[in-house]
Amino acid sequence: MKKVDVKESAVGRETRIRKQWNEQSIFEQSIQNREGAQSFVFYEGPPTANGLPHVGHALGRTIKDVVARYKTMAGYKVLRKAGWDTHGLPVELGVEKQLGISGKHEIEEYGIEPFIKKCKESVFTYEKQWREFTESIGYWVDMDDPYVTLENPYIESVWHILGTIHEKGLLYKGHRVSPYCPSCQTSLSSHEVAQGYKTVKDLSATVKFKVKDSENEYFLGWTTTPWTLPANVALAVHPNMEYVKAKQEGHVYIVAKERVQDVLKENYEVLSVHKGEELLNISYTAPFPMKEVTNGYRVIGADFVTADSGTGLVHIAPAYGEDDYRVVQSEGLSFLHVVDEKGEYTEAVPFLKGKFVKDCDVDIVRYLAKEGLLYHKEKYEHSYPHCWRCDSPLLYYAGESWLIRTTAIKDTFLQNNDSVTWYPDHMKHGRFGKFLENMVDWNISRNRYWGTPLNVWECESCDHQFAPKSIDDLRKHSTKETQEDLELHKPYVDEVQVCCEKCGGTMTRTPEVIDVWFDSGSMPFAQYHYPFENKELFEEQFPADVIAEGIDQTRGWFYSLLAVSALYTGKVPYKRVLSLGHVLDEEGQKMSKSKGNALDPVDLVNQFGADALRWALLVDSAPWNAKRFSERTVLEAKSKFVDTLVNVYSFYVLYANLDEYNPNETYDVKRTKLDEWVLSRLHSTTKKVRIALDDYQFTNAAREIAALVDEVSNWYVRRSRNRFWESGMNAEKAAAYETLHDVLVTISKLIAPFTPFVAEDIHLNLTGSSVHLEDYPVVNESLLQPKLEAEMNAVLQVVELGRSNRNQHSLKVKQPLAELVLLEHNENDMDWESYRDIVMDELNVKAFHVELDETKYTSYQLKLNFKTAGPKFGKNVNAVNGWLKQLSQDEVQNFVSTERAVYEVASGEEIVVTTEDVLVEKVAKSGFSNTTNGQYTVMLDTNVTEELLQEGVAREFIRAVQEYRKQLNLPVNLRVDVILDTEEELQQTLTNHKELLEENLLVKQFTFGHLTNEDDELSLGETKVRIKLSATK
């Protein structure tokens, strides 16, 4: 075995391992070795390569890698195809910035074709960084053969899917109000909108709409979007709701009866009550009368009106509200548009023409006030949608769009979702399920340039539509011969014209591109160019057994995958969804570069290693929980887990090499109870880890492994050191080597999916083979000893209590004590005699015994809890307090046992005192200190005799010399002669414990003599010792 370089950095070790993987094609071998095995399918959600990875990507890649590695080691064939999401607005915006242009007008001036070429060039700007990040974090995914959404085969599959949807009559062109980004100048789908809500404070206004032909009567309407008022065409009331006419300061106001107090506040008089239906068709004067409104400015009925907020009357602007649009359509009222595609007012609002509408709320309110039409204004905090790409506030804007009739197959969506297992479970019928319940038709078109062209050609003569499902299909219907290598992007496909089958007219392509979420939602099919090729491979790889991405994909990729599959095949595309929580900073705030609190995962890997980063992301909390994260989190993972394991591994290699131990040879072995215990712990942990991983409970599995590694290091190895230090090779020493070898090899397999680099380093050195080509460990039931584990757990509890006791009373473990008494509070069949030597050695005591009668060593003190007793006992509280203080120890013991006592006051009244009224404190017998955990109480004799004190000094000297040997980098098996120069009292103490010193320090000869200032000096408290070591001849 190669010597372990404990000074090698984590990133140095991981770089070395990566090189070995690449040279030996270990990733490829891990898949090839499972050829013919059952497939386990997972899909890679495609990232965009025109932005850099963040810590959230590290979590996602870690989880996906853990699943894929575990399932591979569990016997499955796991294909891992990478993917790139290459279309969409982010790419366009990046190119605009690069070119120094902005907006559609400037893009078209620059030229569509050169702009598209620039987009194509820019999409892989950071591919190298993504590849390096992916490899450095240990995520095994095939990046040499990825699916890429901009490539013709991928687009052709998307066309086949959308063409099929059109064929089913589910794709239609409609005029409707959609969420619209004025900055990007395109509409968005409902699931995109759901990703970008922000809490904002907007100016709200309660507006006076004067009843026509009245002197002082007004409808009051409340709006949080004053900018929409110039487009008002109606007011809506609920026909079945009650409204009042109320007089205030000479004006009569009409509001909902339930809202009158909140709106008018005070000094008003209700004149009459009316049903909403009585108000229908009453005309009013609009705040911004428009001549285009030939049918409007009257009250209409709508069932979406409520009295939950506002005035109970809704101002209707059909161009900027979905409900508004529907009700105006049904009423046959006029339609009014006063805002252009840039979100700026048109000449219809002359005094605000050219201004961005969201910046004009104050101007509108000032105008209303000037005209005497403002009743009230205030800032209103509410949730408002923003563009998930550019962060601009959205408008609801009427226009033509291509939509998919998802509502027509809503039941299929819901049924498919019911068959999916969600992690966490509440997502299924909560956030995701509710989104499906409230779905609207999918706005699939985008008025942009860089994307999959929407494959619908429309006839200029008869409005017939043609939706080709393949390139060949398009070629067959083209009016001219198309080039062989036709690129399926604008402007190239726009040049293809089709002959109308219906009337013989010319058909041109509708100019829009497809929503990028449709691109990524098509990946189960398009990644294999289905249905044009790879049908068998597709069928093998559909549906996914699991997908895993961030929670923000609930209304993104998780939805688009489900939607595309339901629309295309009717089937569910995945069996399980792992919805990962946000990675926050240590204050619980979302990380962002603008805030300066973002952590770069590449920097974390370089500083602490990928294993530490992965472990930190897994062990802290379940991955679906939002987690606070910092450099300190990763440092702790490195020091507490990775470094601890490396130290155990290094210890084993060091001594096995010294003793020339060969695990492939046969030795006479005699396993101790400690060996049997650690093997039982190893296999019971394996059992728990497999159960956890099969249920995707990564954190539970990681914590089980962490506990095992800690016990192996801080209990098994520490308790076994003397066996390794012995000279020669006896049966117990051989058993220690064999056991630790088996433990380390099995642990390397257990951790391989979690921390693949250190796992590989250990396994490769101990066995000569890659751990990632091994099977995952299975439980050896014959090695399980639950009773032994329970007993050793009890020993560990007692030892921990003993250490805590020493710490609380400033008694160093090196200082021997006379006695430990263990008080057991519950009788059991624990054989403490078998563990006597372990407890005595661990806690450095000369005697140990178990006592069931705790009254021999402890007593109780009762103190009145005035916080609860004061109100309960009132004037008798002081009397009760005095009575408690004079109770005998037997009476106190009886109270503790029964948890109640009765005190009779002078008047003869009986007062019942319970444990709620009293603070019970356990007090140790004089000369003893106690620590308890409820099940056990450890009593330590704290009287330190002179003899014990001297032995404590000798043990401190041993510790100091051992540290000194480390500083000198002396081989651990080197025997030395020691010369000491110190005061006479210490000389005597060390002489008296010569045998103890020689046994623990590999010293052949101790002598005392005069040393010079050139020799080294050790400190034992305030005492100085000069020391000189020389190798034994």
Swiss-Prot record:
It is an enzyme of class 6 (ligase). Keywords: Aminoacyl-tRNA synthetase, ATP-binding, Cytoplasm, Ligase, Metal-binding, Nucleotide-binding, Protein biosynthesis, Zinc. The keyword Ligase applies. A motif ('HIGH' region) lies at residues 47-57. A motif ('KMSKS' region) lies at residues 590-594. The keyword Lipoprotein does not apply. One of its GO terms (biological process) is isoleucyl-tRNA aminoacylation. Disulfide bonds: none annotated. One of its GO terms (cellular component) is cytoplasm. InterPro entries: aa-tRNA-synth_I_CS, aa-tRNA-synth_Ia, Anticodon_Ile_ABEc, Ile-tRNA-ligase, Ile-tRNA-ligase_type2, M/V/L/I-tRNA-synth_anticd-bd, Rossmann-like_a/b/a_fold, tRNAsynth_Ia_anticodon-bd. Its main location: cytoplasm. IleRS has two distinct active sites: one for aminoacylation and one for editing. The misactivated valine is translocated from the active site to the editing site, which sterically excludes the correctly activated isoleucine. The single editing site contains two valyl binding pockets, one specific for each substrate (Val-AMP or Val-tRNA(Ile)). Catalyzes the attachment of isoleucine to tRNA(Ile). As IleRS can inadvertently accommodate and process structurally similar amino acids such as valine, to avoid such errors it has two additional distinct tRNA(Ile)-dependent editing activities. One activity is designated as 'pretransfer' editing and involves the hydrolysis of activated Val-AMP. The other activity is designated 'posttransfer' editing and involves deacylation of mischarged Val-tRNA(Ile). HAMAP family: Ile_tRNA_synth_type2. This is Isoleucine--tRNA ligase 2. It comes from Bacillus cereus (strain ZK / E33L).
